[in-house]
From Swiss-Prot:
Residues 651-660 have a biased composition (Low complexity). Residues 872-899 form a coiled coil. Pfam families: DUF4629. Residues 755-779, 790-824 have a biased composition (Polar residues). Residues 459-522, 539-627, 649-668, 692-835, 856-879 are annotated as: Disordered. The gene is C2orf78. Keywords: Coiled coil. This is Uncharacterized protein C2orf78. InterPro entries: C2orf78-like, DUF4629. Residues 546-567 have a biased composition (Basic residues). The keyword Coiled coil applies. Residues 582-600, 692-702 have a biased composition (Basic and acidic residues).
Amino acid sequence: MHWLASATQTSASIVSSSLLSAVDVSSSLTMSEYFQNTSLPGTANSRQFSLPVVSNAAFLTGSISNFSRASAPAISSAWLQPSASGTSFQPLMGSAYLYQHSSTTMLSGVTGQSHICTSAASYPGVFEWDSTASTVKKSSSLRDFTVTVIDQNTAVSSMSMTAQYYKTSDTNTMVPLYPSLSASLVQGTLTQIPNQQGHNLSLPCQIGSQVYYYNQGTLGPQLSCLQSYGSVSYTGYRASAHQPEMVMVLKEVQPTNVLPPVSTSGMYYSVSSQPITETSVQVMETSLGMDTSLGLQSPSQTFCLPQTPEFSKSFSSRNTQTLESNPSPELGDISITPVQSPTNLLTLSPAPSQEKNENENLDEIKTNLSKPLDVHQILIGNQDPPLLPVEIPDIHPLLACIDPLGQEEQPGSENANLRNKSLSLEDQGIFENGIESSSDLADITTWVEDTYLPPIFSSLQDLDQPESPSAKKAKDTSAIKVNQVQEKSCVIKGHSDQVRKNKHKASEPIQGAPKAKIQPKNPECLLEREVVVGSATVSNSASVNKAKHSSNKPHKAASSRISKTKSHGQEKTKGNRKNSSKKSEESKQSGKKVKVEEKQTIPNMKRKKNQPELSQKTLKKPRSSLGMHMLESVQVFHALGKKIDMKTGFSSSRTLGSSSNTQNRQPFPALKPWLDIQHEGKGPEKIQVKAQKLDGSAEKECTSPSHSELPPPGKVKLIPLPFLTLDQPQARHVSRRPNPLASRRPAVAYPARPDSTNSAQSNAVNPSRPAPTNTSLTGPATPAQPISAKATQPSSANPTQPTVPQSAASRPSAYKTSSCSSLQREPVSTAVTSLRSLPKPQNQFLIQDFSLQPRPWRKPTVPEPVMSTPITEEQRPEREAMKRKAQQERENAAKYTSLGKVQFFIERERDMEIAEYYGYTI
C-alpha cells in the first residue's frame, strides 16, 4: 500500500503516497491559501503553500494516515504537485490517488507568482485536512485555526479558519460540515528570526499544541534518530476526545538526471494511541531530501513508519510517470508534463526503497539543496481537526522543483488549466455548484462534490477576494480567455463572478424571483454548465434554482411572484380583491401579471356577473339554508312587490326576499336588473319590496330615495314590531328570530365586501342607513335598508309610528330591521346613532338585551300582519320568473359569497349558534 512516485526534474510531479493503508480517512478537504507577496516591488507574488494534513483514526497505532486527494471519497489523502501539463486522477493501489495537473496544485484556490531571490516559482498552496477526526469525539464543534505563511521576503499571510465538524453517531468519525473560513490575509513584515539555515523562522503559537522543529540536515541518509532543532512546547489542555492525528511529510528531492533518493530509510512519527492530552507538531528538516515530516506527538506512543523499497520510485520520463514498483492497475499511465524548473522534486511520504540511489545521489542532493526546507510550522489546536496554521519560510529548492504556477505570462494549456483550476477553486460557485472549470477539473469537481470542501473554498475565496480581487479577476479573465477553448471556461469566469454574487445573493434571503433573475448574470453559461448556481449550498441551491427558474422562466416567476405577493398577506377573498387591484397595477407593469390578474379577476367577474343579478343576493342572502329559511319565515315579500302571507310567501320570500336582499346588498351591477328597476321605481321588484317595507317605513319617511318611494297599490305594508326601544330591536335584530340571526350573520359575514359595493348602493338606496348595513345583511339587507330607514326615520320623523308600524310590519321588517340594525350598529351608526348605542356590535348573534326584547310572535296581541292580496294572473308568470331567477341567484350565491366560496361548515356552525342562541331548531 505504500506508493511513492516522484517524477524526475522534467516530470516534476508529486505522487500521492498511501502510508499504511490501515489509516482510516473518510475524506480529505483541501484548502488553499493565497496571498500576494509584496516584498518584491513591481511583482505580484502569490504564494501557495501546500500542507497536507491527514488525521488518523482515533489511534494511529503503527500506521500513518496517507495523503491522498481522490475524486472519490479518499481513504487516504495525497500530496499533489503540479505537472507541466495534463491532469489526471488515478487511484494508486486503490488507496492513494495520483493527481497531476499543469501549473497548479490540484485544488489550489489561486495560482500566483512568487519571485524569491532570483527564482520565480509558486508554491502549491493546498491545505488538506482529513475530515476523519478521532473516533472518540463526542460532539460537533467549531474549530478555529490560524495559518501563517512566512516567506523569506517577510510577506506574512494569516488567516483564521473555522471548520465545523459533525460527528456521525455510526462511524464515530468527525466529518467537516461546510467548514467556513473567516480570515483576512494580512501582509506584514515578520520579525526575522534567523535560524541556522539563515531562513526566517516564525513560531506561531497556539495554546494546547506543541510545535517541534527538527533539523536533520546533520543526519546521515539513515535518519535513525531525529535531532531536535528547536522545540517550543505549549502545554495542551486535557481533552476528553482524541486529537485528530496528523502527519505531514514534505520531501523534496533534487535529482540530476538520475533517480534521486526518494527518502531516508525511516521516519519516526510519535503519535498517541490514547486520547491526546497534548498535541505536538514536529517539523523535521533534512538537507538530504528536504524530508520534512509533521507528526502529532502525544506522550503515549511513537511508531516508526517503515519505508519499503517498492514504496516509491522516481522516474525520469519526461511526459509520463510510470510506477515501476507495485503499479496499481488503476494507475495505468499517468500523464505528467515536465516542470519548467525540474531541479527539485517534492514528494510526500518517505520511502527508503532506493537506498542505493539515495546514497549515490545523497551528495548531489545535498549540494543541490543548499537551502533545506527550513521549517514547516503547524499549529494544531487541541481537538482541532488538522486545521493548521502553517508557517513556511522560503524554500528555494521547493520553489525550484515546483513549476511556477502563478506565471500568467506562461502561455499554453498549462496556464489555462492552472487558471481554470485556480478559478474553479477561487470560484466558490464552482466547487459549491459542482461546476467543472475544465475537463481537467471534472474529477476535481466530483471530488469536491463528494467532500465538504466547497464552503471552505468559498471562504478562502472570500479571503482571496479582499486580498487581491483585481489580480484574481485578471487571472480569471486571462485564464478564461486562455481556456475558452477548454470546457467552456467562460462559464467559469461568469460563474466566478456570478457564483460569488449569486452565492451571496443566494445566501441572502431570496426576496423572490426578481433577484433570482438578476443573480444568473450568464444564465446561458449556467445552463451550459448544467450547474445550478445555488447547488453549491443547500440554501443557495434553492435560491439558485429559483434564479434559474426565474431566468429561464421570468414570466412564470413574475406571475408566481405576483400571485405569491398578492396572496401572502391577503385572505383569499380580500386577497382576491387586492390581488385583482394589484394585478391591475401590475398588469400595467407586466402582461403576465395581467394574466394573473385576469385569472383572479375572473372569479371576481363571475361574482360580479352573479352579483349584478345575484351578487347582491350573494352579499345579502344568508349563506346557509337555515339563514334562508329564517329569512323566508321573516321576509315574505313578493318579488313583485306584494307581501305574501307568511306561509305562502316563504318560498317566494325565500327566493324573492333573499334574492332582493342579496341584490340590495349586492353592488349596483348586481342590482342593476333589480336595484336599478327598484331605484327607478319598479314597484314590483325589490324596490317595491323596499317600498312595501317602506309602506310602513315610507309612511315613516324613508330617507332612502328608493325607500322613499311608496310601494305601488298592490304592495304589502310592513308593520314594524313594537320594540321597547328602537335601539334594542336594532341591537337585537331579534324581532325576527330566524331572520335577525340569519341577517346578522350574513351581515357580519358579508359586510366587509358589501360595504364597498353595497355601501354605495345602500347609501344611495338608504341614505339614512349606512351602506355597511346593507352590505352586511345578506338576506335581509334590502328590507333591512328600508327598515333601518324606517326605524331611523320613524324614530326621527315618525317617533310614534316606528314601534307600532314596525310591529305591524312585523317580522319581515322587524327581522330585517333588527338584522340591519345590528349590522347598522357597526355601519349604521351614522344613520342611526341611537340605534348604534347597542352594545357589542361585534357580536353578530348574541345581543345582550335579546332576552329583554319583546318577542311579538309570542304575543297574541301582535297586530295582524298586513295581508297582501294575491297577485293577479298577469303577474303570475313574472313572479314565477322572478322566483326562478331568485333561486338561481341563491344557488350562485351559495357558490360564491362575499368572502368567496361558501364555507359550509362555518356557515353551519354560525347557523347552529344562532339557532341555539335564539332557541331555533335546525
